[in-house]
């Protein structure tokens, strides 16, 4: 069973559910400046600057790596919270419909963004009926409730890069 929340990076995995945000630390280790050595005993103020073309290129490359490590993703937390509550409700309802725990549930994929992309309520209901075709219990009430819950929601937009 999976509830898909959006594009590739924000998709809920097999059992985790919910959008995931990954943070990457800058390359270069424990936070010391690249190229500095703690064993030399001299501080940066004491050492003379080296101004060669090769050194400048190396520093520029290290700065690029550092900037790549500092890029963070900013999501609308309120929208993510709504989405998470909805996903938890869906998992609970599917458990009742299929009469089993989440781990034992057949693979049912309900893509919320796909439903929000649909042109009409009828198209959304049709997609949900298709996803729940193997369910032996009546699904009309679940579909009606899910459609009413997503009515005010927006599709999760691709993550925006925060300015550094």
From Swiss-Prot:
Q: How does it sit in the membrane?
A: Peripheral membrane protein
Give residues where Omega-N-methylarginine occurs.
27
UniProt GO cellular component terms: cytoplasm; endomembrane system; membrane
Feature: compositional bias, Gly residues = 1-19
GO terms (molecular function) for this protein are: protein serine/threonine phosphatase inhibitor activity
- Tell me if Phosphoprotein is a UniProt keyword of this record: yes
**Which residues get modified to Phosphoserine?**
25, 33
Residue ranges with Low complexity bias: 50-62
The name on file for this protein is: Protein phosphatase 1 regulatory subunit 14C
| Species this protein is from | Mus musculus (Mouse)
Q: Which gene encodes it?
A: Ppp1r14c
């Amino acid at each position: 069973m999976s509830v898909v929340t959006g594009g590739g990076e924000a998709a809920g995995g097999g059992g985790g559910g919910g959008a995931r945000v990954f943070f990457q630390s800058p390359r270069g280790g424990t936070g010391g400046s690249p190229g500095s050595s703690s064993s030399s005993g001299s501080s940066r103020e004491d050492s003379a600057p080296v101004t060669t073309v090769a050194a400048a290129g190396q520093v520029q490359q290290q700065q690029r790596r550092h900037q790549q490590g500092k890029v963070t993703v900013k999501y609308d937390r309120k929208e993510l919270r709504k989405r998470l509550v909805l996903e938890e409700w869906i998992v609970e309802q599917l458990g009742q419909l299929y009469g089993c725990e989440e781990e034992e549930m057949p693979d049912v994929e309900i893509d919320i963004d796909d439903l929000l992309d649909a042109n009409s309520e009828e198209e959304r209901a049709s997609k949900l009926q298709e996803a729940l075709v193997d369910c032996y219990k009546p699904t009309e009430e679940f579909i009606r409730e899910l459609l009413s819950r997503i009515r005010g929601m927006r599709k999760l937009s691709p993550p925006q890069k925060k300015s550094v």
